[in-house]
Every structure is written in C-alpha cells, then in structure tokens.
C-alpha cells in the first residue's frame, strides 16, 4: 500500500486539513460514546507537535445537504475537545477561507451539510483543497465512499496523505489478509449469509478455516442436513453454503442452545445439533462446539473476527460468543476485529487490550475484506505517484 504518510511529512507552518471520523452518538448536546474522538486525538496532537495550522472536519449523522440544523452540528465534539484541554473553535462558514492561528484547532462544521458533498462535486472538492497545503485522510470508516471530503479534496490538494489511524488500519488489514501467518482463521457471524456472501467467498480463498456464527451458521447447519426449526436461516442459500463447505474447512456446530421465542427471558436449552425440534430456534452454539472452536483459535497464527456466534445481547445465549471472545483474547495470534456487533462484544467482555487491532470502520472493513478497492485509499495511492 504505497501512500504518503502524515508521519513522514514536515508540517511546520503548513495549513493541514484533516478528514477524521467524528461521527459520534450525541444526546442532549453531549457525546455519549467518545471512542472515535479518542481515536482521533493522537492525530490532532501530532499535527500540533509538527507545528501545523490544524483544521479538522467530519460528517455527523445524516443531515440534508444545504440545510443546516442545530442537531447536525459538530459543537458537541468541540465541547469534548475543549474539556480535553485543546484550544479549539468551531467554524461554520469556511468554504471561502479560514484563518487558523498557531496552536489552535479549527473544527470545520459537518461536511454533509455542504451541497455536493455526497456526490463528490469537484467544485466542492476544490474549495476544500484551497483551504490547505496538506490534506490528511484519517477516516477509515468512510474510505469506501467517494465524497468531496474523502476523495475530491485528495484529488486537488497540493499534497494528499494518510493519517496515522488510516495508515495503521491499512497495515493491520494487509497483515491479516495479504500474507497472513498461518493457520489463518476467520470468524464470520451475523444474521444472514446474503449480507456476508462476498466476505465468505473472499475469505474462502485466504483462510485455512472459517468459523460461522449466528443466523449464518443456521444456514450451514441446514445445509448439513439438520433441522433448524424456526431458526433464522436462508433456505435459498443452502446450495451456496454447501459449495462453500465443500471447498473450505467450515466446522458446523455439534451442539446448540435453543429457545422457543426471541426474548431476553426465553429459557435456553442445550442440545445436540441433530435434535432441534420444529418449534425451537437456535440462538447460540453449545459448550462442546464453543470448546472445539476455541481450540481451533488457540492454534491459529492469524485471526480475523467479524460478528458474534450467538445472540450475545441476551445473557442466556451469550456463552458461545464469550468463550470465542476469550479464546481470541488469550491467543498468541495476530488478531483483527471489526464491525459494530463485534466491538460491542469486545466491550462487554472487557478484552479490548487483548485484540491486536480493532478496526474503526464497519462498511469499509467489510469491503476491504471482500477485496474491493476503497476509493479514498485509491486516490491517495494515485497522488503518491504524482
């Protein structure tokens, strides 16, 4: 991945425009989950240490272009950064130029309010580019979208580079997918095979084993000839599951936890995979399966984790995901995890410091795993050549 890196540049006195991912949940004007801001702070500090004149922007929520509403504002992010000790201010009217003082951070208001942002209007890209000497793309979570603040600005800025977060993300994904230490094990959970089909196809060419979980596993259980009762599964994708299972080592659970209804209070019953009744639904893998899969993970040298193996939000159906999570945490393998539910499981079981790399991007993470080109990375590669 040959891109210019912000860490390698002399930024003294330069106007630096950082596209970060500060799309955080906000309630009553306060940030309710600060993970993305915390992840961006080292980039801001580095830019200040290098003597840059720092501008940073992001999208927040899904505003209507050209119609600014107070709830679309990045003001809560500015308040958070102020409380963290930064000299920071919000600039709403910035497209025709911004004055940035030494040592201050200017947060440029929500880019998605600007007309032409989403469809990557070149005129808007040029306006962003005119604000800076160096454009820094540091929002991996939006790298799969070609928009004016992720792609257009990179086309027209004097220099376009990858920020520390984006560079680390690309390095970690490259390490897991391009030349993984073997055995390489992928864990793919989620409700539907259809939404992860390209991920499964791509990983089947890379991974030594694929562990499937959630509704995806139910389709593979059905493909192996077992009754799945009322479980969520995709009957039309059984041929696809059979083909994947024939060409890749995909262990099917030997036992499962079932319930009669999808609720937190449902009674969990553990049983062999071939004993599921017509009125039962599979909500988790059983202990034997979890231990077998934990053993596979223990012997792995690379683990890519995307999705839980059961309905871990319900305590009765949490054990499978808990055992798998701790197996990954205790493994010596290089581990990379991504996706919203996966991050929630990591938080729940308190294992964040034991995962080698936690990806910040949901859709971008999956598209990279699928082998797709991420537009915002592609333009950085092009600009690095010229």
From Swiss-Prot:
Gene Ontology molecular function: ADP binding; ATP binding; phosphoglycerate kinase activity
InterPro entries found in the cross-reference section: Phosphoglycerate_kinase, Phosphoglycerate_kinase_CS, Phosphoglycerate_kinase_N, Phosphoglycerate_kinase_sf
Listed GO biological process terms: gluconeogenesis; glycolytic process
Entry binding sites for ATP: 196, 313, 339-342
Primary location class: cytoplasm
This protein's pathway: Carbohydrate degradation; glycolysis; pyruvate from D-glyceraldehyde 3-phosphate: step 2/5
Compartmental location: Cytoplasm
Pfam families named among the record's database cross-references: PGK (PF00162)
Reactions catalysed: (2R)-3-phosphoglycerate + ATP = (2R)-3-phospho-glyceroyl phosphate + ADP
RNA-binding among keywords: no
EC number: 2.7.2.3
GO cellular component, one term: cytosol
Keywords attached to this entry: ATP-binding, Cytoplasm, Glycolysis, Kinase, Nucleotide-binding, Transferase
Binding site for substrate: 21-23, 36, 59-62, 112, 145
Family: Belongs to the phosphoglycerate kinase family.
Self-association state and partner proteins as the record states: Monomer.
Name of the featured protein: Phosphoglycerate kinase
Taxonomic classification: Bacteria, Pseudomonadati, Pseudomonadota, Gammaproteobacteria, Pasteurellales
């Amino acid at each position: 991945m040959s891109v210019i890196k912000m860490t390698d540049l002399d930024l003294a006195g330069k106007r630096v425009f950082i596209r970060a991912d500060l799309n955080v949940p906000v309630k009553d004007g306060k940030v309710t989950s600060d993970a993305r801001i915390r992840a961006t702070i080292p980039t801001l500090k580095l830019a200040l240490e290098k003597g840059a004149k720092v501008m940073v922007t992001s999208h927040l929520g899904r505003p209507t272009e050209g119609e600014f509403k107070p709830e679309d504002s990045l003001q809560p992010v500015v308040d958070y950064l102020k409380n963290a000790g930064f000299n920071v201010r919000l600039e709403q009217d910035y497209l025709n130029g911004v004055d940035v003082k030494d040592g201050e951070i200017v947060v440029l208001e929500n880019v998605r309010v600007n007309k032409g942002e989403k469809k990557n209007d070149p005129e808007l890209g040029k306006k962003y580019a005119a604000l800076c000497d160096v454009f820094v793309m540091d929002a991996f979570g939006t790298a799969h979208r070609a928009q004016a603040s992720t792609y257009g600005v990179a086309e027209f800025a004097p220099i376009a580079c990858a920020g520390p977060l984006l560079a680390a993300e690309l390095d970690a994904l490259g390490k897991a997918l391009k030349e993984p230490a073997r055995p390489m094990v992928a864990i793919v959970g989620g409700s539907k095979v259809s939404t992860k089909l390209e991920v499964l196809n791509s990983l089947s060419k890379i991974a030594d084993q694929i562990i499937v979980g959630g509704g995806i596993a139910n389709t593979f259980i059905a493909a192996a000839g077992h009754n799945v009762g009322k479980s969520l599964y995709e009957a039309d994708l059984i041929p696809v599951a059979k083909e994947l299972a024939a060409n890749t080592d995909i262990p099917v659970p030997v036992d499962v936890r079932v319930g009669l209804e999808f609720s937190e209070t449902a009674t969990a019953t553990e049983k062999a995979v071939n004993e599921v009744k017509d009125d039962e639904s599979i909500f988790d893998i059983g202990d034997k399966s979890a231990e077998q899969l934990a053993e596979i993970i223990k012997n792995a040298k690379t683990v890519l984790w995307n999705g839980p193996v059961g309905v871990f939000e319900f305590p009765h159906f949490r054990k499978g995901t808990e055992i798998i999570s701790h197996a990954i945490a205790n493994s010596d393998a290089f581990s990379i995890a991504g996706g919203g539910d996966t991050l929630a499981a990591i938080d729940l079981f308190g294992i964040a410091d034991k995962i080698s790399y936690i990806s910040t991007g949901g859709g971008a993470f999956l598209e990279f795993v699928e082998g797709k080109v991420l537009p915002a990375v592609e333009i950085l590669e092009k600009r690095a050549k010229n």
